[in-house]
């Protein structure tokens, strides 16, 4: 029997977002007090992200007959990430050249107050590429889970799953236990997801209440350019990839609409990570591929962040009348390919990564970040939405490459609506 419309999750989230915007606009002081509601929802999701990734990866790998497959899946995923990320970076650069959102500002860098972005710059300087790679190795097994470090948890799960596969029947009781634990955790996700409207309301009310809709007006051209470029990337680039694999990108976006609305409300792609993994399994992707590709993608396949990075850097250059040679722009692309890998699905991570990029490209004034500081929160939503679609498509593509995509499930799932709570029950 079809649910009444008021009980449908994505409808509840849409209504909550609209109410949050209205409260933030008309009662900003009260709206900023709603922040704990959004924070609490994200914390609840983060509470189960680590264990879910661990269980999904371990059970997926433990069931593999050929351990070489782990390296093969990982290699294909990283190859896909690099190719598509490069397209995203180039598209961001090309769109900014074409639409020129920063031209006409004529800002003197000497008049900008760099103190406002000093904290972001300090965080950006704090980690080199070697530090990032070393950080993947946890201090202890417990610390990876207690600190919610996705890549560290993924490393532990890979080793744990490989050992379980190696010991064979002796490890079967442990595998069965982890599979049962996984079912319980996804059941928890189904319960937590029902609170998504409250979380989306709180986060959106705080954003509008603190920054105000009026703060968007001077920068509408940049915001519009970013949103338009992201839509073009999803529809054209990801749409072409999806067509090559055998599915429609618009149907896929409709399939994950609940997760996208949660991301829109909370401005964090991590807020929908467990639900996305569940939906991708229901779509016909194998558990082992989902477990490997999705968590890795949250650090290495942030398409929305990549578009934002090149666009923001070039916008600052245009606004401050800083001329960049083609050689410098190619250097910018190379640097951004590295710095963007340090970003995560957390709100504000893109801005810290931008600071890291500008620190390596000294021609552009770091203080220019002040120009977009006030609107970054509004651009964060688009980054997160593009990231979640990109990671979803990547998982389907790698599953297809591995011949572990159930085409009948794919067709059935994209032809009807499957909610997270339904998936959890299954």
Swiss-Prot record:
NCBIfam families on file: PRK01663.1, PRK13027.1
Functional note: Responsible for the transport of dicarboxylates such as succinate, fumarate, and malate from the periplasm across the membrane.
Keyword DNA damage included in the entry's annotation: no
Primary subcellular site in the record, as a coarse category: membrane
Any one Gene Ontology cellular component term annotated for this protein: plasma membrane
Keywords: Cell inner membrane, Cell membrane, Membrane, Symport, Transmembrane, Transmembrane helix, Transport
This protein's name: C4-dicarboxylate transport protein
Species in which this protein is naturally found: Paraburkholderia phymatum (strain DSM 17167 / CIP 108236 / LMG 21445 / STM815)
GO MF annotation: an example: succinate transmembrane transporter activity
Pfam families reported in the protein's UniProt record: SDF
Subcellular compartments: Cell inner membrane
Gene3D superfamilies: Sodium:dicarboxylate symporter (1.10.3860.10)
SUPFAM superfamilies recorded: Proton glutamate symport protein
Family: Belongs to the dicarboxylate/amino acid:cation symporter (DAACS) (TC 2.A.23) family.
Transmembrane regions: 8-28, 44-64, 78-98, 148-168, 184-204, 222-242, 297-317, 355-375
A biological process term (GO) from this entry: L-aspartate transmembrane transport
Membrane topology: Multi-pass membrane protein
């Amino acid at each position: 029997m079809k649910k009444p419309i008021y009980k449908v999750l994505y409808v509840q989230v849409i209504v909550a977002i609209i109410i949050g915007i209205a409260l933030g606009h008309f009662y900003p002081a009260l709206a900023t007090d709603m922040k704990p509601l959004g924070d609490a929802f994200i914390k609840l999701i983060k509470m189960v992200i680590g264990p879910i990734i661990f269980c999904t990866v371990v059970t997926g790998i433990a069931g593999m007959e050929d351990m070489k497959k782990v390296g093969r899946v990982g290699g294909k995923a990283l190859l896909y990430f690099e190719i598509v990320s490069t397209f995203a970076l180039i598209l961001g650069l090309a769109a900014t050249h074409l639409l020129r959102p920063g031209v006409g500002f004529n800002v003197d860098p000497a008049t900008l107050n760099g103190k406002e972005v000093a904290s972001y710059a300090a965080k950006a300087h704090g980690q080199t590429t070697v530090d990032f790679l070393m950080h993947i190795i946890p201090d202890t097994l417990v610390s990876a889970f207690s600190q919610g470090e996705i890549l560290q948890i993924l490393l532990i799960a890979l080793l744990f799953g490989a050992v379980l596969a190696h010991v064979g029947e002796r490890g079967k009781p442990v595998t069965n236990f982890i599979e049962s634990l996984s079912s319980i955790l996804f059941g928890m996700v189904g319960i937590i997801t029902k609170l998504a409207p409250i979380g989306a309301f709180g986060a959106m009310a705080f954003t509008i209440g603190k920054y105000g809709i009026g703060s968007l007006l001077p920068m509408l051209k940049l915001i519009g350019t970013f949103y338009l470029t992201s839509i073009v990337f999803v529809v054209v680039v990801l749409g072409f990839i999806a067509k090559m694999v055998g599915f429609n990108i618009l149907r896929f976006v409709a399939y994950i609409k609940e997760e996208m609305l949660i991301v829109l409300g909370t401005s964090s792609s991590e807020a929908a990570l467990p639900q996305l993994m569940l939906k991708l399994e229901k779509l016909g992707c194998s558990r082992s591929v989902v477990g490997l590709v999705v968590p890795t993608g949250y650090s290495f396949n942030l398409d929305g962040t990549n578009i934002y990075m090149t666009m923001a850097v070039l916008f600052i250059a245009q606004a401050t009348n800083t001329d960049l040679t083609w050689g410098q722009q190619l250097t910018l692309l190379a640097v951004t390919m590295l710095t963007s890998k340090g970003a995560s699905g957390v709100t504000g991570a893109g801005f810290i990564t931008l600071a890291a990029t500008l620190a390596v490209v000294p021609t552009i004034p770091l203080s220019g970040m002040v120009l977009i500081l006030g609107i970054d929160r509004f651009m964060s939503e688009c980054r997160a939405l593009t990231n979640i679609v990109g990671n979803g498509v990547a998982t389907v593509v790698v599953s297809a490459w591995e011949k572990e995509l159930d085409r009948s499930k794919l067709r059935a799932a994209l032809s009807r609506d499957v909610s997270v709570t339904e998936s959890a029950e299954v």
